[in-house]
Amino acid sequence: SDQGSSAGVLSGNAQDAGDWAALPNAYLSWALNKDLYVGVGMGAPFGLVTEYNRDWIGSAHSIKFDIKTININPSIAWRVNEKVSLGFGLNWQRMEAEYVRRAGIVDLPAGAGGVLIPRPLSQSFATLDADDDSWGWNVGALFTVSDATKLGVSYRSKIKHELEGSLSVTGPNPVFNTVGSSGANATVELPDTFIFSVAHQLDPKWELLGDISWTGWSSVDKVDIMRSSGALAQTLDTDFQDTWRVALGANYQLNDAWKLKFGVAFDETPVKNPEKRLT
């Protein structure tokens, strides 16, 4: 608890920090001829939203984390022959981040005899708002092994975001609000991914699907939040590890108008242990 702060005791259950979110996805493609196709896709490959009450016990670590990405992916695909097709794409990606926590600022009220006594200002809050646009690429190949079986491989590159924005402090002390606020920046390298997939047409009704993917989350080792002066404001020690994901599924052609899809997946977490978990 925070007995000596101007806000009194910090306590309480964090409650449910998650909520519903909309994930935009759209895809279009055009055939230039029988062997050459172009297309464009839009999606949100990475995102996070957690928000707690401002008086919860972990508010000095995090009150709100809101990370959004939008990815636009123009691509081209070429059918080399009846057995092999190749694809290549560019990725324009926008990232927006908001991070709010209780500020680690110390007030210095005069105690007995005029002595300055440090005291946390738990009524003060620090907010980081930052964004960036960046580019990446992806490649893929599709192999027709037989009339019933197809294999696919794809790779999507890392995308390095150099986020720029502001770090603002709000609270009861206008001096600390002014001194604590500044421009800010942070660098985040979102991970690359490799996917191997297989599809097998079991019969006219059933199609079996499977894939295994690897994501290089170790690229997000830590995130340094820097002030525009060059001073370090905070380090987020993410220390993520690379992960694997395995998925199995099936499509069932109910009739000419309807296809039913089923699937299950096991996805590893990039967080090494509970002590490394970000709120």
Predicted regions, residues:
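Outer-membrane beta-barrel porins/channels
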Residues: 3-13, 20-279
